[in-house]
């Protein structure tokens, strides 16, 4: 059987196609149930996120997987990538580590890979091959993240701003944060802030219903934008990212808020273009203003740091791929080795039982031992000897060379039968 990965991601397909390709809600367990019934597919797992849909499977025929995908998610063929065996192993390790993510080094993907593994196990599509692969992938991701700084620094504007806020007002559970707007940047900031257990979260927006929805998701309080100035003084930290054409937080607003706060410092992040906060706010004592340009410099430095860490992580993954494939190779040879050992022990036990019976019947020990030795020799050597003769007649030099490696010729010792057979083959084989 062969290990395959078929999938698409943010690099190969646009958002609308990724949405159509995803398996969410009840669709995922139904898909796994369908995969379990496919012929010649021993194991399967589905990884489905907003940025990727991937099918991991053990099968002799990748076309079966392609046909299944076309049936369940038509129109993806031109956007799919396919990886096999070592390339498939490498791909999973890179995905779990965050090296294949839209945001380099992001950690959320590891949890999503674990969910994929867990779901496949629950629905009976996970066997020894994929279980071993995913478990090894988890270890590789942990090792890479522990031994590099691949995920150490934030690489989005929102996460960088939250990190600066955490550094300035630590801990956040003693701070009040005001978010202005409900767009993607503010949503991401709200997520990071709620993870940091901010004490109080206020959300102001022109459309109050959107503010209420975001507030309900993160345990905050919604405000109409018209009441912004009434609550400005309550905020230790302000994040603003709206589409307003002119600033909505003015120098005079902040000056009044600082007066009410008795000059207790305020930290303000203007994440909007055009700006939401007047630049003059940055000139006020006890008001610390950061703009997108300020944050972008920090973000780029963090990205550079992650790119450097990614090079080290890639080297770790290459080493782990080799080790994993070596382990698979070793496992592949276990079955014939077990059969060889079973053949040897069974032969030994059978002839030993016969010898003991002969001794019990009064047969001379020397005769019994000699017969036992001859019997063992003949029984154990007959199968490989016959196989080597057939190999020589068929000009199968690979098997003959393997035998020569196992039993190297010593000085003064010859294998006349084997040598004669090989010479005969060379002389009589018209193809040689």
UniProtKB/Swiss-Prot annotation:
It comes from the Bacteria. Possesses an unusual extended V-shaped dimeric structure with each monomer consisting of three distinct domains arranged along a curved 'spinal' alpha-helix. The N-terminal catalytic domain specifically recognizes the glutamate moiety of the substrate. The second domain is the NADPH-binding domain, and the third C-terminal domain is responsible for dimerization. Its EC number is 1.2.1.70. Substrate binds at residues 49-52, 101, 106-108, 112. The keyword Oxidoreductase applies. Pathway: Porphyrin-containing compound metabolism; protoporphyrin-IX biosynthesis; 5-aminolevulinate from L-glutamyl-tRNA(Glu): step 1/2. During catalysis, the active site Cys acts as a nucleophile attacking the alpha-carbonyl group of tRNA-bound glutamate with the formation of a thioester intermediate between enzyme and glutamate, and the concomitant release of tRNA(Glu). The thioester intermediate is finally reduced by direct hydride transfer from NADPH, to form the product GSA. Keywords: NADP, Oxidoreductase, Porphyrin biosynthesis. HAMAP family: Glu_tRNA_reductase. Homodimer. Gene3D superfamilies: Glutamyl-tRNA reductase, N-terminal domain (3.30.460.30), NAD(P)-binding Rossmann-like Domain (3.40.50.720). Belongs to the glutamyl-tRNA reductase family. NCBIfam families: hemA (TIGR01035). It is an enzyme of class 1 (oxidoreductase). The record marks 91 as: Important for activity. NADP(+) binds at residues 181-186. GO terms for molecular function: glutamyl-tRNA reductase activity; NADP binding. GO terms for biological process: protoporphyrinogen IX biosynthetic process from glutamate. This is Glutamyl-tRNA reductase. Residues 410-432 are annotated as: Disordered. Catalyzes the NADPH-dependent reduction of glutamyl-tRNA(Glu) to glutamate 1-semialdehyde (GSA). The active site is at 50 (nucleophile). Pfam families: GlutR_dimer, GlutR_N, Shikimate_DH. The keyword Repressor does not apply. PROSITE patterns: GLUTR. The gene is hemA. It comes from Xylella fastidiosa (strain 9a5c). It catalyses: (S)-4-amino-5-oxopentanoate + tRNA(Glu) + NADP(+) = L-glutamyl-tRNA(Glu) + NADPH + H(+).
